[in-house]
Amino acid sequence: MSTAIRSGRQSNWEAFCQWVTDTNNRIYVGWFGVLMIPCLLAATICFTIAFIAAPPVDIDGIREPVAGSLIYGNNIISGAVVPSSNAIGLHFYPIWEAASLDEWLYNGGPYQLVCFHFLIGISAYMGRQWELSYRLGMRPWICVAYSAPLSAAMAVFLVYPFGQGSFSDGMPLGISGTFNFMLVFQAEHNILMHPFHMLGVAGVFGGSLFSAMHGSLVTSSLVRETTETESQNYGYKFGQEEETYNIVAAHGYFGRLIFQYASFNNSRSLHFFLGAWPVVGIWFTSMGVSTMAFNLNGFNFNQSILDGQGRVVNTWADMVNRAGLGMEVMHERNAHNFPLDLATVESTPVALQAPAIG
């Protein structure tokens, strides 16, 4: 009987595999990292160059380019990588699809390059979180929590352009461009009146409130291990077994401040709640944007209250609607003469009754 004895030397491939999956590396790479690193590098490099030096982009497809880069007069606030042209629509537009580099830049090709590599990169980052958790024997909830901001990015950069029929409707990659996207989104979809957006607001603001409450309660109930002249931070040693704060004192304080059952007496359920609240809220916002992408918009309570003579009694819903019409009139002002709401429905009278003539 013969036994095959394997050589003690590792092949280059085996050494590479071991290095990629080694959890003792200062920064864990992982197989998802092999995809993440080049994609995020490509997105970052292209974004930086485009933000600084990209020529104007014909975003509306009407031969009226919009400048977004710094060398064309923008600053950090007003600058952006302008979305690809409405003439391109939803077509995949890599460099080799254009007749020249100038054409690719004019039609906003860098926007697609940045967005696609960025979305692949952050998706791989989520996979890398799961991969590292798996190799360390941890539970997988870190990548589940990260899926909330990932879903938000997918909604505004991918799902919304798909629903609207053009990548020109995607969110510009800049500060003022983000605000413009938000204003136009409200004008066209009434997002403030959508229940899923309301849940997202509750998730973000509630998460901030709960985070501040938890941090302040813990900091206020630390077990003193130092003198009055030393920082309390020196009383904690990394990896210590005993609790660093008195959860009973924190529970008693908060239970008396509000009422008993508003305070958690279980540290594990408390931290699950702190993680789940904002994550679920942002999930709902992403679902809301994804449904509004296909024009399933927020509630419409316009002119819903009438007096005894049939005249409109305005509500805040009417004020929001009026503001939305104003924003819709101003955006893409050269692409169409009137916003769709004004062009396709019965006109809103500017006076309650016609003046008598003669």
Curated annotation (Swiss-Prot):
Which PROSITE patterns does the record associate with it?
REACTION_CENTER (PS00244)
Q: Which reaction does it catalyse?
A: 2 a plastoquinone + 4 hnu + 2 H2O = 2 a plastoquinol + O2
Q: Where in the cell is it found?
A: Cellular thylakoid membrane
Which sites bind [CaMn4O5] cluster? 169, 188, 331-332, 341, 343
Q: What else is known?
A: Cyanobacteria usually contain more than 2 copies of the psbA gene.
Question: HAMAP family of this UniProt entry?
Answer: PSII_PsbA_D1 (MF_01379)
The protein's name is Photosystem II protein D1 2
Identify the species of origin.
Parasynechococcus marenigrum (strain WH8102)
Q: Which gene encodes it?
A: psbA2
